[in-house]
Amino acid sequence: VERSNLQRQVVHGTADIGDLKVRSAAHTLTALNPDIHIETHEVRLDRSEQAEKLIANYDLVCDGSDNFGTRYLVNDACVALGKTLVSAAVQRFEGQLMTWKPGCACACYRCLFPEQGQTEEGMSCSEAGVFGAVTGVMGTLQATEALKELLGIGDSMAGRLMMWDALAMRFNMIRTHPDPTCPACGAAVVKG
């Protein structure tokens, strides 16, 4: 946990600076509800084999990572293993939410963002910064979408990308389509 995390990651506090995020989050969540079971994994995802090994044990994955490398690893592992992925991302005053499901003719994260993104000013996500309230809104939307998927209720976000502009207080929804040349889910990959 770093001081710069505190304004946008409310699960951590000042006393947690220097601790592993996974430990800090588990401690906070257990303090909120001591009856829940939390399974932690103290690893940094930096290899596809590692991501697949971790993700293989779950039915649904929520990704809220703050860097493109991890987002790609999580996406690729979910696609390869056929696991539903609910992905939320934020940068500056904007957020986006999408769901990928196995068997759905919908775009995966890599289809929509084939190259590691940057802002108009050429800054990475960490350099551009994040307005803290945007993470709260996107986290709530992500949790709602994940629960809908697990319970099989409501309309799935699969095949759509939701974008939120906090400065304009405007949501936009666009239909997405898989990229047949996508290295994660494209036609050549699927045919094997």
Task: Set out the residue ranges of the language-model regions.
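Adenine nucleotide-associated cytosolic modules
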Residues: 1-192
